[in-house]
């Protein structure tokens, strides 16, 4: 079991409650007005966040927010807002490696790193991202087990065993895993 920003995560089933993760600021999210600039309706975003927190209180299941951003400028706007209004852990979810690096620098400079879970490292993540994670002392990351080499769930363990040492070398001590289940019949 890990503790991330005061929240217990993972461990043996039944010892800590399952954590709910809700996404915000994704492409098409109703609160986003301009995804490139990170402009959004703050009142509506806070309402949606409070609803998630209420659900967490009602169910006893802790909540995290997957903060999705198109670039580092948008990420900075979303992060500043979220850090001001909630104590919840935040998943940093940005596709572009350059934007990930810029955002990690911003998070480090603003003193937010203890609240952040990097989402995510995958088999194609470059060495530059691992170096940056170590440099900014990010302890929390998700390993995304998505690879054309390891499609079946039966061989995801081999991929995980390849990725764990790299993450640990980068200073990631709290490793979460996204196994990426693909429902082939629906494709």
Name every feature range the model reports, one short phrase each.
Residues 2-155:
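Active-site beta->alpha loop and helix N-cap motifs at the rims of alpha/beta catalytic domains
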Residues 133-187:
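Catalytic alpha/beta core domains of metabolic enzymes, predominantly
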């Amino acid at each position: 079991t890990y503790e991330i920003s005061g929240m217990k995560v993972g461990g043996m089933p039944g010892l800590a409650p399952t954590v709910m993760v809700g996404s915000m600021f994704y492409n098409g999210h109703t609160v986003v007005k301009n995804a490139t600039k990170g402009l959004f309706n703050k009142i509506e975003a806070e309402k949606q966040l409070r609803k998630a927190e209420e659900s967490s209180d009602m169910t006893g299941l802790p909540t995290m927010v997957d903060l999705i951003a198109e670039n580092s400028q948008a990420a900075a706007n979303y992060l500043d807002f979220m850090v001001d209004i909630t104590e919840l852990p935040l998943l940093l979810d940005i596709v572009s490696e350059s934007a990930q690096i810029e955002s990690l620098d911003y998070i480090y400079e603003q003193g937010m790193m203890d609240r952040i879970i990097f989402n995510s490292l995958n088999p194609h993540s470059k060495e530059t991202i691992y170096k940056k994670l170590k440099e900014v002392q990010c302890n929390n990351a998700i390993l995304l087990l998505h690879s054309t080499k390891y499609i079946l769930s039966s061989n995801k363990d081999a991929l995980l065993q390849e990725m764990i040492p790299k993450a640990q070398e980068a200073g990631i001590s709290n490793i979460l895993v996204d196994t990426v289940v693909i429902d082939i019949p629906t494709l």
